[in-house]
Amino acid sequence: MTTANTTAKDNAATKKRGRKAKKRVCAFCTDNIDKIDYKDVARLRKYITERGKILPRRITGNCARHQRQLTKAIKRARQIALLPYTVE
């Protein structure tokens, strides 16, 4: 039991001393993109993992509005077979 407590304390200490992560900025806001186009497959692929999952907002740094639009665009592109649902 002491090893579990020690490990938890070490992790907490590392987080306190660790370097603070840089705040990510929404790429769509910086490029002044209002609507995300589902036909822009090259841009959409940046926000999909190698297994075909949509990356979350905390990783991509998108704002809530653009993350919702991005999700809809990816799902729409999957329906018309521009993007795969899963990668084999």
Swiss-Prot record:
GO terms for cellular component: cytosolic small ribosomal subunit. Residues 1-11 have a biased composition (Low complexity). One of its GO terms (molecular function) is structural constituent of ribosome. One of its GO terms (biological process) is translation. InterPro entries: Ribosomal_bS18 (IPR001648), Ribosomal_bS18_CS (IPR018275), Ribosomal_bS18_sf (IPR036870). It holds the Pfam family Ribosomal_S18. It comes from Thermoanaerobacter pseudethanolicus (strain ATCC 33223 / 39E). This is Small ribosomal subunit protein bS18. SUPFAM superfamilies: Ribosomal protein S18. Keywords: Ribonucleoprotein, Ribosomal protein, RNA-binding, rRNA-binding. Residues 1-21 are annotated as: Disordered. PROSITE patterns: RIBOSOMAL_S18 (PS00057).
